[in-house]
Regions:
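Non-ligating segments of multi-cofactor redox enzymes
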Residues: 1-114
Length: 114
């Protein structure tokens, strides 16, 4: 197998703007509703009463999620139509003409990526 590729993501700089998601969609010209990359928000906490004022104890952070092109991808193994394959360069490929949209790949993926 050739050199493996990756997508560099610096979470400390992410503001959740989804520019990476839009750029991926634009680059690959995916149809409406298909996002090969998506930005996920994790947030929580609450406001605390401190004396007679409210004090924020909240957090929010974002992460960019996409296929990690695993060496032994379970998504390829669970696909009932063999729409998902591993190319010679190690990337996972989805053959749209075979895919029936069952989402078994997404359910099996430890990253919920496809």
């Amino acid at each position: 197998m050739s050199e493996r590729l990756g997508f560099y993501f610096d979470q400390s700089l992410c503001t959740g703007c989804k520019a990476c998601q839009i750029a991926c969609k634009d680059k690959h010209d995916t149809p409406l509703g298909v996002n090969w990359r998506r930005v996920v928000e994790f947030s929580g906490g609450s406001w605390q009463v401190v004396g007679d004022t409210f004090s924020p104890r909240v957090f929010a952070y974002y992460t960019s999620v996409a296929c990690n092109h695993c060496e032994d991808p379970i998504c390829v193994r669970v696909c009932p139509t063999t729409a998902m394959t591993v190319r010679a360069d190690g990337t996972i490929f989805v053959d749209d003409s075979k895919c029936v949209g069952c989402r078994y790949c997404e359910w099996a993926c430890p990253y919920s990526a496809p």
